[in-house]
């Protein structure tokens, strides 16, 4: 048998055990026709990222599921990998280059990509090594990267298929533009923040009447791009202005007044300025009324100037403009200013010209980039889009039919809202790091050629000069294919794809249901004909101890690696799931981590005690039933119950409940009761009883370690290997299941009667400050004496009884006696010589007053007809039970006071 150290030190165990697992190949999974597959794909963390609490909870939950299924006999595959994270990684590389005095343009695309790949090589393994520190039992032989050869092949295959079906198109559309990242982002990537702002009330003169039209805007800098103002055609206030024009202040330019439902008669003055190039609603109004589109912002957040206008004019002159191509304004004195600088300057000029009526403060939601948090600019830009309606419909139906379930179910609504309201997906990004769009443009005739590999000639004109689109695809385009691209798709004959796909469970946070979950679902259905998984298990975010979201600005982030270094990975893992509920946010608590560490120490010490009491020739295995005593059958029944309950919890993704159950079983049932109860048998001199106690101790410990293993894998492996008769690793041992032959419910009930009585006696002695060395006789009044009679050794040891008398009805004197009562027995114990009488009387009188107050409260409730008639029956019954217990409690106290004279 392996000898355990006196104290558990995770730093001496965890790395060694993880390397043992890697060396043994225990994480590797292959297709096995004799086993049922169970597959999870890891949500790929950013390749440049570092482990945070979100990763920790996400991967702990996945590891619990995979380790459980592996023990249950499944071919359990957990596919790991990392995401290339276009915007985040490119920003990191650009920042590093800036320190060298370099820009992307200075080194060129190839030079930049060389640096980006070097960055990925240098930092890409950091997050992987951190996931290993957590104990993640992924099949690292299958580790993938969203830009590896297989994933790149899948991306090109999908792009070409969608293009050929007319589901991918390129055009000038309104997009969300980040002027800092200098790229478009999708609707799902826009985060909204409440900010202080203003409504500026402007006055536009009507050409035909000379009157002033009042309108309000939060963005006066866009007015230079106004090409109309809108009124509602049904608004009687402006019926006389149909067909009229206004003079655009500052530019002195005539623009039309159009009638459109976008102008809401109930809001403000009912007049709105229309800037088709810089507002999505205005863009739609512009299309309806065939208004010019005039861009006044550059893509890096400045006002356009003469050079910008000249470039756009040249495009139009050459006939290379496409549908909805915007014209560009030379903003004159404002050219080159940032948008905020221009806002201030324009407001000064409007006020000077008498066009600014008033300024009204307001709070409003402002769209920001999810990566850099810069304010998003709606811009007309030529981008690639995916038509969403044909793809969204099957994805909605799949969830409606129950092919895919969300846990908790309430998150189905989030998914449905996103899918039913989604617009066409802008998939192009003005970045260099990522999957370059597989589209080429003929320099001679302008033909667009979409193909998986570079074409040699233009299919339209035969020209040989073709230039690839410089843009890359949205990161989520490749990660949407993750469940099947990692298993060999588009090779539909792949053995892994046939066996492991569709996957089973996706574990992820609620914040990326729109970003990622929805896109994987429609992608799986569209390209494989199958839903990519059957269950989406949603977890909340980890907040700080005050319930605040962890953020750099608050400085309240917790580094999981620091927690692991201090307490061990098992303690962190257990804290993250113990008591958690699916879908709900959780709070990080150092006290809970300490409690988990203490739990690990308790288990370590309990195992050491068991091992120290085993002879060298010990052979594990349960003895025959006739050799088991009441306590053995009790603990085996409890073990059976917890095994069944935990299996049910894990089947329903209730990991918090399962963790709480094994914690309670090991701490309360096994350590605090069964080990203590076994000690007298181990030291009794009865060899057969001692052997039985040892065998049951080892058997229960073995099963308990296996039940705990998915939650605390390191310590359970170390302790399991120390047990006599253990196999090579706990990881591949069978998961404990319900053993119908171990359901001794009668013995369980009988033993718990004894336990309850012992607890009551010990509580009474503690309250009376009676030292454990002071023992006394006792009389037990009970209708069922058998359990107590067979447990006299436990009564002597744990209730401090010198001798015990049993009676069905006690009729003796009670002077000097203290009573303890349980639902099954009443004890009469002579305590006078063991206590300080005056002090105990004072305590009892205080307890009596408290008990009388409690009893009166319950009586008032039960004497209230309205409560009894209107409250739920279960609540009324609960109050009646509490009332009865309160009566018994008061009677016991009064009897004890009487006994003390």
Place the predicted regions along the sequence by residue.
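Short acidic-hydrophobic surface loop/beta-edge motif
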Residues: 200-207, 244-249, 367-371, 440, ...
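Structured ligand/cofactor/substrate-binding pocket environments in proteins
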Residues: 54-66, 73, 82-83, 151-154, ...
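Short, polar/flexible loop-turn hinges at active-site or ligand-entry regions and domain interfaces
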Residues: 100-114, 335, 405-406, 561, ...
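N-terminal, positively charged nucleic-acid-binding surface of large information/translation enzymes
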Residues: 1-234, 275-288, 292-311, 343, ...
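Short Cys/His-rich metal-coordination motifs, predominantly Zn2+-binding knuckles/fingers
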Residues: 181, 251, 372, 443-445, ...
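Feature 926 captures the class I aminoacyl-tRNA synthetase adenylation module centered on the KMSKS loop
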Residues: 201, 417-477, 481, 526-569, ...
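Active-site-adjacent bridging/hinge elements
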Residues: 34-42, 64, 100-103, 128-135, ...
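Secondary-structure transition/capping motifs at alpha-helix termini
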Residues: 67-75, 96-109, 129, 133-138, ...
């Amino acid at each position: 048998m392996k000898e355990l150290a006196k104290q558990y030190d995770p730093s001496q165990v965890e790395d060694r055990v993880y390397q043992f697992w890697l060396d043994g190949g225990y994480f590797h999974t292959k297709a096995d026709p004799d086993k049922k597959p169970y597959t999870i794909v890891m949500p790929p963390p950013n390749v440049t990222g570092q482990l945070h609490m979100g990763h920790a909870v996400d991967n702990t939950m996945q590891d619990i599921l995979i380790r459980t299924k592996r023990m249950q006999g499944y071919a359990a595959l957990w596919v790991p990998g990392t995401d290339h994270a276009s915007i985040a990684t490119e920003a990191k590389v650009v920042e590093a280059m800036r320190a060298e005095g370099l820009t992307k343009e200075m080194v060129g695309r190839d030079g930049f990509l060389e640096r980006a790949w070097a960055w990925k090589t240098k930092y890409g393994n950091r997050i992987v090594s951190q996931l290993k520190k957590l104990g993640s039992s992924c099949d690292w032989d299958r580790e993938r990267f969203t830009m590896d050869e297989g994933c790149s092949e899948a991306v090109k295959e999908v792009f070409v298929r969608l293009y050929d079906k007319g589901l991918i198109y390129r055009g000038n559309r309104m997009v969300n533009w980040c002027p800092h990242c200098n790229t478009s982002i999708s609707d799902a990537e826009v985060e909204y923040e409440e900010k202080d702002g203003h409504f500026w009330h402007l006055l536009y003169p009507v050409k035909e009447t000379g009157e002033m039209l009042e309108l309000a805007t939060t963005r006066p800098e866009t007015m230079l791009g106004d090409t109309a103002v809108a009124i509602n055609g049904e608004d009687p206030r402006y019926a006389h202005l149909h067909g009229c024009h206004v003079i655009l202040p500052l530019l002195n330019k005539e623009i039309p007044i159009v009638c459109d439902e976008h102008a809401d008669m109930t809001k403000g003055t009912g007049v709105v300025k229309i800037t088709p190039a810089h507002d999505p609603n205005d863009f739609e109004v512009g299309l309806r009324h065939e208004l010019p589109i005039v861009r006044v912002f550059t893509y890096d957040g400045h006002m356009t100037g003469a050079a910008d206008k000249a470039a756009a004019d040249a495009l139009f002159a050459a006939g290379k403009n496409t549908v909805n191509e915007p014209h560009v304004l030379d903003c004159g004195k404002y050219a080159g200013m940032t948008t905020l600088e221009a806002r201030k300057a324009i407001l000064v000029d409007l006020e000077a010209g008498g066009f600014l009526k008033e300024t009204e403060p307001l709070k409003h939601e402002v769209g920001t980039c999810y990566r850099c948090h810069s304010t998003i600019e709606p811009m007309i830009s030529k981008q690639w889009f995916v038509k969403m309606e044909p793809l969204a419909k099957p994805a909605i139906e799949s969830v409606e039919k129950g092919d895919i379930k969300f846990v908790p179910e309430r998150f189905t609504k989030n998914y449905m809202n996103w899918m039913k309201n989604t617009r066409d997906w802008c998939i192009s990004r003005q970045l260099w790091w990522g999957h370059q769009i597989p589209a080429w443009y003929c320099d001679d005739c302008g033909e667009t050629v979409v193909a998986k590999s570079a074409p040699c000639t233009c299919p339209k004109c035969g020209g040989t000069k073709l230039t690839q689109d410089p843009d890359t695809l949205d990161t989520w385009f490749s990660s949407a294919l993750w469940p099947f691209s990692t298993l060999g798709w588009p090779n539909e004959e792949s053995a892994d794809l046939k066996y492991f796909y569709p996957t089973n469970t996706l574990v992820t946070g609620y914040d990326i249901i729109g970003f990622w979950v929805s896109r994987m679902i429609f992608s799986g259905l569209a390209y494989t004909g199958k839903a990519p998984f059957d269950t989406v298990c949603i977890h909340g975010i980890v907040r700080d101890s005050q319930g605040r979201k962890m953020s750099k600005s608050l400085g309240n982030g917790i580094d999981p690696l620091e927690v692991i270094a201090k307490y061990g990975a098992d303690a962190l893992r257990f804290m993250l799931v113990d008591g958690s509920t699916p879908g709900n946010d959780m709070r990080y608590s150092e006290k809970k981590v300490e409690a988990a560490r203490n739990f690990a120490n308790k288990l370590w010490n309990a195992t050491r005690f068991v091992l120290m009491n085993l002879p060298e020739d010990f052979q594990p295995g349960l003895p025959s039933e006739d050799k088991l005593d009441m306590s053995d059958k009790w603990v085996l029944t409890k073990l059976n119950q917890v095994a069944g309950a935990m299996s049910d919890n894990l089947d329903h993704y209730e990991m918090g409940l399962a963790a709480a159950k094994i914690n309670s079983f090991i701490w309360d049932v096994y350590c605090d009761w069964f080990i203590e109860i076994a000690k007298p048998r181990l030291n009794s001199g009865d060899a057969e009883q001692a052997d039985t106690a040892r065998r049951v101790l080892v058997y229960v410990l073995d099963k308990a370690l296996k039940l705990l293993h998915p939650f605390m894998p390191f310590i359970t492996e170390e302790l399991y290997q120390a047990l006599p008769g253990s196999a090579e690793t706990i990881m591949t041992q069978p998961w404990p299941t319900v053993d119908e032959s171990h359901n001794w419910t009668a013995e369980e009930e009988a033993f718990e009667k004894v336990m309850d009585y012992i607890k009551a006696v010990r509580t009474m002695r503690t309250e009376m400050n009676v030292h454990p060395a002071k023992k006394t006789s006792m009389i037990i009044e009970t209708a069922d004496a058998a359990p107590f009679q067979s447990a006299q050794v436990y009564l002597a040891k744990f209730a401090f009884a010198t001798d015990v008398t049993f009676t069905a009805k006690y009729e003796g004197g009670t002077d000097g006696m203290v009573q303890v009562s349980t639902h099954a027995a009443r004890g009469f114990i002579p305590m006078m010589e063991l206590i300080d009488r005056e002090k105990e009387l004072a305590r009892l009188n205080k307890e009596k007053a408290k008990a009388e107050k409690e009893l009166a409260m319950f009586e008032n409730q039960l004497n209230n007809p309205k409560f009894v008639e209107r409250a739920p029956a279960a609540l009324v019954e609960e109050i009646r039970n509490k009332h009865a217990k309160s009566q018994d409690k008061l009677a016991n106290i009064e009897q004890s006071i009487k006994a003390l004279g």
